[in-house]
Amino acid sequence: MLATGATVSTAGLAQVDREKIYQWINELSSPETRENALLELSKKRESVTDLAPMLWHSCGTIAALLQEIVNIYPSINPPTLTAHQSNRVCNALALLQCVASHVETRSAFLAAHIPLFLYPFLHTVSKTRPFEYLRLTSLGVIGALVKTDEQEVINFLLTTEIIPLCLRIMESGSELSKTVATFILQKILLDDTGLAYICQTYERFSHVAMILGKMVLQLSKEPSARLLKHVVRCYLRLSDNSRAREALRQCLPDQLKDTTFAQVLKDDSTTKRWLAQLVKNLQEGQVTDPRGIPLPTQ
């Protein structure tokens, strides 16, 4: 009897929870009740598997989330964003991330060009905590998109300014923001279209190579195994392109060729393997002249 009662109780609780979800979604439409609804729904986004379709298909909900984003544009420049404003808009961004990563809503999310609403946040440079949290949460939405490995995501992102935005954050952001931005670049590079796009012109490739080189130098002074892993993977993927491979033979940082990172990577067999493969890729196809000088193949 106890077991039966427990089952009924759990089912009843689930129904109550669903009713609360519906109530909070409705409350998003009203400015008076929106802040609490954002907070409660963002807490539930992991446990309610169909929250994304519910948000997308309910009347006025996405418009309300976009209104939350647009409302803080004036606080970006000049940078006056408060912790309270940042927390509130990041709850809205968390719900958009939920929509971005769900298979039923992702295509519509891209078709509506919603990621573009986040780009002004990625342009910010203020180092204060509210801005850092805002940038990191915005990167999380883009990261959720690329994590799906869907071709349509890469095709969409390549029509936008996401690569230069990520490169700027990779150069000057916090370690966590740098890590997510580098992960996004890595995912773009791992797609054949993305690799071809970045290696299409010298300007694009050299910008990426320059920032990665600066990061290696910085990592040699302030090591981060997690960030280094993504940097090495970006380099390895670039070496799959013949033109990029030629250029990398000249500009790959010495720190990736010597023992600078041996201690950082001692327990990371995957990154060590990638690094060894990168060095091997750059050595293959080289011709040595009689004086022992490596010459690039024609």
From Swiss-Prot:
Keyword entries, A-Z: Activator, Cytoplasm, Nucleus, Repressor, RNA-mediated gene silencing, Transcription, Transcription regulation, Translation regulation
A single MF term (Gene Ontology): transcription coactivator activity
Single GO BP term: regulatory ncRNA-mediated gene silencing
GO cellular component entries: CCR4-NOT complex; CCR4-NOT core complex; nucleus; P-body
NAD keyword on record: no
One Pfam family in the UniProt entry: Rcd1
Annotated InterPro entries: ARM-like, ARM-type_fold, CNOT9
Quaternary structure and interacting proteins, as annotated: Homodimer. Component of the CCR4-NOT complex.
Family note: Belongs to the CNOT9 family.
Protein name, per record: CCR4-NOT transcription complex subunit 9
Recorded name of the encoding gene: cnot9
